[in-house]
Amino acid sequence: MSQNNNDIYILGIESSCDDTSCSIIKNGILLSNVTANQSIHEQYGGVIPELASRDHQKNIVPVVDAALKKAHVTLSQINAIAVTRGPGLSGSLLVGLSFAKSLALALNIPLMEVNHMQGHILAHFIDEEGFDKPTFPFLALKIGRA
């Protein structure tokens, strides 16, 4: 994968509920998206917050590593880290935020905290060929399950 000095690589981390996800974006193009699902909750009929945060702790390093490998990108190429800051399960968010903040500090790169709901809405403007930037302001309706 060729790189020039103007390339911008962003590592994104999502851990607001029971999925641990990491994506790598280069200049607005999605290079990789890796998710670890937590099947442990199926037996309870819903997400158990404490179990979710424990699984995030177990999954976050392998998920980030897999996303970097799939994108053929090294940590030294990453220019910034984006991470979900909420809303979500507090323990799950804490795992993602702590990991992202520690990594950003270690790499001496910016950390961008992302609102989970805004992320759902704006994710529709990302595709594998780049961004179609929305014209702001705009109105959106987000319907979720409880």
What are these regions (language model features)?
Residues 83-107, 126-127:
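Short Gly/Thr/Asp-enriched flexible loops that form oxyanion-binding sites at enzyme active sites
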Residues 1-3, 105-106:
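Short glycine- and acidic-rich boundary segments immediately preceding or forming the N-terminal edge
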Residues 146:
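Conserved small/polar residues in nucleotide/adenosyl-binding loops
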Residues 71-77, 99-116, 123-125:
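Nucleotide and nucleotide-moiety/phosphate-recognizing core
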Residues 6-87, 120:
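N-terminal beta-alpha supersecondary unit
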Residues 2-6, 114-138:
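Conserved phosphate-binding catalytic cores of ATP/NTP-utilizing and phosphoryl-transfer enzymes
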